[in-house]
Amino acid sequence: MANVVVVGAQWGDEGKGKVVDIYTEFADDVVRYQGGNNAGHTLVVGDEKIVLHLIPSGILHQGKRCIIGNGVVLDPEVFIREITNLKAKGKFQDDGVLLLSESLHIIMPYHKRIDIAREANSGAKKIGTTGRGIGPAYEDKIGRRGIRLMDLLDKQVFSRKLKEFLEEKNFILEKLLGERPFTFEEIFDEYSAYADTLRNYVADTTLVLHQDLKAGKKLLFEGAQGTLLDVDHGTYPYVTSSSTCAGGACTGTGASPRDINEIIGISKAYVTRVGSGPFPTELEDADGEKLRHTGGEFGATTGRPRRCGWFDALVIKYAVRVNGLTGIALTKLDVLSDFESIKICTGYSYNDKFLNELPANLDVFEKCRPVYEEMPGWQSDITGVRSFEELPEKAKNYVKRLEELAGCPIVLVSVGPRRDETIMLKNPFEA
């Protein structure tokens, strides 16, 4: 038996959706443990592209239980829309396989309005929030002002808490942000209607997980965003508001650290980032544009063009360290196929010093310049390759060099967006 955590090893958008989709075949439960609809998983099934923001990728596999844990903040409107769309496409029929933690926190309308207004008023200090209300919802969770799913399902409790919290939120909206306040009735009526649908999926998911673990079932924990966006371990303040690292799989679901056997970090064969913040290997030239165009680097959630750059070994070394990675899934190797030469960042130059580890100080990180080594490209189509041995020699050398620099084995290589365009070197569920 093995239970596996999948985390982003960079700044998000690494291709976790595809890898989770592949690993789901070997799991019984797929569990989402943090974030909200600020993340987007893009899956290509046959000729169809499916984007999921909240519901775990495992929903596309029959007989798999999908759980959204207590660490997630849920926008009911988005959740219901995803269910409706999946059902319309014939991808989801059995309500019983999808469970919501009764303890997860709800994104309220005032969270979204506050989020958008703050970002608009931030000027040069914008962090690049998606405006989905994720940060303000987590603020209220930590500040003990949050409304949980169990509260929403009880009209008396929901009414009491909404009245209690709305006065403060309206003060912030009107007096500090210059925005329109909400009436109690407009929120209460809208969210009470959502509750009627949500109650069909609610469960004590921590208990369900432990029962499944006791029964010997295999669990796959699905993270969102990436290590460098973790609220504690990321490039603060240019981070998300949740624990994106492997430890979040426990706090966000109620699973024990002893239940985790394998931790797989997902990394592109290059690097991308959305929003503001330091990015030493960013390319603002023809190579960067080529990566963006060839890799289709536009956000699944926002549609924003992603910043693109060469592979940064220091970022991956850091992800290996703070997550305890047991393996790396390398994605989008095929995107590099047209490059005559490829660069790898092996260190940083800072004030005439050479750094071989990621600096914790943001001011230092922002001033770091990449130190590169260069490798020849393979300049051939690899999307039809299904074994490591079949890869061009120069592609194999590139993968081996990344593995060496990361200090962690590469256990999967993605050579295209489709599910079958994958080379699995080691199955973590059989470890």
From Swiss-Prot:
It catalyses: IMP + L-aspartate + GTP = N(6)-(1,2-dicarboxyethyl)-AMP + GDP + phosphate + 2 H(+). Gene3D superfamilies: Adenylosuccinate Synthetase, subunit A, domain 1, Adenylosuccinate Synthetase, subunit A, domain 2, Adenylosuccinate Synthetase, subunit A, domain 3. The keyword DNA repair does not apply. Its EC number is 6.3.4.4. GO terms for biological process: 'de novo' AMP biosynthetic process; IMP metabolic process. The active site is at residues 13, 41. Keywords: Cytoplasm, GTP-binding, Ligase, Magnesium, Metal-binding, Nucleotide-binding, Purine biosynthesis. CDD domains: AdSS (cd03108). It holds the Pfam family Adenylsucc_synt. One of its GO terms (molecular function) is adenylosuccinate synthase activity. Pathway: Purine metabolism; AMP biosynthesis via de novo pathway; AMP from IMP: step 1/2. One of its GO terms (cellular component) is cytoplasm. IMP binds at residues 13-16, 38-41, 130, 144, 225, 240, 304. It comes from the Bacteria. Substrate binds at residues 300-306. Its cofactor is Mg(2+). PANTHER family: ADENYLOSUCCINATE SYNTHETASE. Belongs to the adenylosuccinate synthetase family. Plays an important role in the de novo pathway of purine nucleotide biosynthesis. Catalyzes the first committed step in the biosynthesis of AMP from IMP. This is Adenylosuccinate synthetase. It comes from Geotalea uraniireducens (strain Rf4).
